[in-house]
Amino acid sequence: MVNTTIKTTKSQEIFAAAQNLMPGGVSSPVRAFKSVGGQPIVFDHVKGAYIWDVDGNQYIDYVGTWGPAICGHAHPDVIGALHEALEKGTSFGAPSFLENVLAEMVIAAVPSIEMVRFVNSGTEACMAVLRLMRAFTNREKVIKFEGCYHGHADMFLVKAGSGVATLGLPDSPGVPKSATSSTLTAPYNDLEAVKALFAENRDQIAGVILEPVVGNAGFITPDAGFLEGLRELTHEHGALLVFDEVMTGFRIAYGGAQEKFGVTPDLTTLGKVIGGGLPVGAYGGRRDIMSMIAPAGPVYQAGTLSGNPLAMTAGIKTLELLQKPGAYEYLERITKKLADGLLQVAQETGHAACGGHISAMFGLFFTSGPVHNYEDAKNSDTAKFGRFHRGMLERGVYLAPSQFEAGFTSLAHTDEDIDQTIAIAREVLSSI
């Protein structure tokens, strides 16, 4: 039995059975709590800023289903819209007006996007973008950054973040060398390394893809001039710049990181928030590039459930909620309060810590820092984070079960939630 102060009998029973049914007992690796130890909790239902497990325990949630729940779980407006949409059917496999509506909203919001294609996941969006980059430039090599995660497709599983970082895997078995031979890597925030790669591979690099704010190696922000430098380098070498905004899109600003930092890429991938909690992905960018996608052009990409009416409905309603005056000001205020409070408590209880936030995204590392890249993140005290995570969980706060994942707030979080979280963090950090 797990040593815990909360009742987890049903969670343990369900997870034990799950391990005989699914690899590791989960449908995605990080959910197994491997890097933080202890027993995963099994959810029963969610509402607003809170989750309840099958044993009846309630938690303040800072995972938000890994990002989509920016308006809070099961928002009544989203649920109401979905009920109406369900009456018309769950999937058409044909064009629907809802695709037009969400496409217009995305194009109006994201500076780089003149045309958009909807898919079913962030991984799918990044796979399609990679193919499109290579087709448009007629080049094969792509630069990615250590610790940046662009889904689980073969060509991106090179020094990746997210679950790969959580499990300590440098790469994944089963990925042939040929699949990654054209994937070049550089440390995040290191422009000189990128310059060297361009110099060594002149006229061979199709583009650069990155999380403009890293959320899959913990929360890491771009140094001043880094994004601008990438924009200049890609222009100079005839390569494309791609922002993977699956996590940051509509979260750190309505127009994403590119609006926040004033740097416009050529292509952008999206997901999470634009589906309002349903499976979704999207990629878009300049019209001349996107016009190469079939059936308008020769670059093939397709999907049975792409643009399905339920995901489109949830996405439309979520973006409507985010358009309300004061939404992002509120997210900035409560997230700053949380991030500053956690750092202050860590320092006052004698722990070396660093971290920060941008709008509704935050992170905390147990190291004096600063953390500029994946190597810095790996040098933080992950064992201490595991103890911190468990202590918070046992006292009713659900944080991402990995040091290498960002945290998320929502419009449903209240000042009382933040105050309670900081108070609990003080209690936990005073005891570890």
From Swiss-Prot:
Gene responsible for this protein: hemL
This protein's GO cellular component annotations are: cytoplasm
Alphabetically, the GO molecular function entries are: glutamate-1-semialdehyde 2,1-aminomutase activity; pyridoxal phosphate binding; transaminase activity
Cellular localization per UniProt: Cytoplasm
Q: Name one GO biological process term.
A: chlorophyll biosynthetic process
Q: In which pathway does it act?
A: Porphyrin-containing compound metabolism; protoporphyrin-IX biosynthesis; 5-aminolevulinate from L-glutamyl-tRNA(Glu): step 2/2; Porphyrin-containing compound metabolism; chlorophyll biosynthesis
On subunit structure and binding partners, the annotation says: Homodimer.
Entry protein name = Glutamate-1-semialdehyde 2,1-aminomutase
One Pfam assignment: Aminotran_3
- Keyword check for Isomerase, yes or no: yes
N6-(pyridoxal phosphate)lysine modification, residue list: 272
- UniProt record similarity statement: Belongs to the class-III pyridoxal-phosphate-dependent aminotransferase family. HemL subfamily.
Q: Which residues form the signal peptide?
A: none
Which keywords appear in this protein's UniProt record, sorted alphabetically?
Answer: Chlorophyll biosynthesis, Cytoplasm, Isomerase, Porphyrin biosynthesis, Pyridoxal phosphate
Q: Which cofactor does it need?
A: pyridoxal 5'-phosphate
Note the InterPro entries from the entry.
Answer: 4pyrrol_synth_GluAld_NH2Trfase, Aminotrans_3, Aminotrans_3_PPA_site, PyrdxlP-dep_Trfase, PyrdxlP-dep_Trfase_major, PyrdxlP-dep_Trfase_small
Q: Which reaction does it catalyse?
A: (S)-4-amino-5-oxopentanoate = 5-aminolevulinate
User: Which top-level group of life is the source organism from?
Assistant: Bacteria
**Does the record's keyword annotation contain Isomerase?**
yes
What's its EC?
A: 5.4.3.8
In terms of SUPFAM superfamilies, this protein maps to: PLP-dependent transferases
